């Protein structure tokens, strides 16, 4: 049994065929595909272990009534808490979410523009983003580099300025920065954000190392401002 065979069997079981008249029927869930795959005669290889984890952890629902598209799901604030999962499960879930999100994003037309401003459809906040960036997710890089056209923004929050440079230098895709207090920033870190020729690098260095809570430097394009954030309790 292959993954493709499991998918085709799940669709056949749901009564969905090449006949367009069947395409409005509820599609099989990912959980059903997982079950179909494991029902077959499969080798206990890497793919098997992944599908076994998906089944054991019950990652997906088997109720089609609970299924919506990714962009429908993101019409309200959603928080994905992966704290209790093992690293391999975290990586699997994040990879699936990013891949599905990117595929749906590409199906959208470009977001509207008016008076030089672009419509924002969805914002994604990734906390402790260094954990994702070092995992080399192709979809993460593509969402960051292509998302603006589709009205998708992404905020990558991390503790260190050098975290954005893994095998892939994510800083090259980022146009806006908000830098709070950072421990031991280097001149090269600042140069990668503000530009090596910026005459104010030493001033930025001093400000960042001495900034108190809610103080930061904001860089939007070529404009740099010292700002005081408005706390949530105000």
Show where each model-derived region lies:
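P-loop NTPase motor domains
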Residues: 1-152, 165-168, 206-223
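Hydrophobic/aromatic beta-strand patches that form the interior of the parallel beta-sheet core
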Residues: 78-80, 155, 176-178
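P-loop NTPase motor core of the ASCE superfamily
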Residues: 162, 168-234
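An acidic- and aromatic-residue-enriched active-site/binding cleft used to recognize and process polar
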Residues: 85, 129, 159-161, 182-183
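A short linear-motif detector with a strong N-terminal bias
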Residues: 55-61, 155-159, 194-198
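Conserved H-loop
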Residues: 149-152, 157-163, 181
């Amino acid at each position: 049994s292959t993954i493709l065979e499991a998918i085709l069997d799940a669709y056949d079981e749901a009564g969905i065929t090449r006949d367009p008249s069947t395409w409005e029927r509820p599609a099989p869930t990912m959980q059903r595909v997982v079950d179909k795959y494991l029902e077959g005669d499969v080798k206990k290889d890497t793919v098997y272990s992944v599908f076994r984890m998906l089944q054991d952890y019950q990652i997906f629902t088997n109720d089609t009534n609970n299924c919506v598209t990714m962009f429908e799901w993101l019409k309200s604030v959603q928080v994905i808490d992966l704290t209790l999962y093992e690293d391999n499960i975290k990586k699997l879930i994040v990879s699936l979410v990013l891949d599905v999100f990117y595929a749906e994003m590409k199906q959208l037309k470009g977001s509207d523009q008016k008076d030089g401003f672009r419509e924002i459809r969805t914002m994604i906040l990734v906390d402790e983003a260094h954990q994702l960036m070092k995992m080399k997710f192709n979809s993460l890089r593509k969402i960051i580099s292509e998302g603006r056209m589709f009205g998708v923004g992404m905020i990558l929050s991390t503790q260190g300025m050098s975290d954005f440079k893994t095998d892939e230098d994510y800083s090259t895709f980022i146009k806006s920065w908000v830098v709070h207090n950072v421990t031991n920033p280097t001149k090269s870190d600042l140069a990668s954000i503000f530009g090596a020729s910026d005459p104010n690098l030493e001033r930025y260095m001093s400000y960042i190392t001495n900034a108190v809570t809610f103080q930061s430097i904001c860089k939007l394009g070529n404009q740099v401002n010292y700002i005081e954030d408005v706390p949530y309790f105000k």
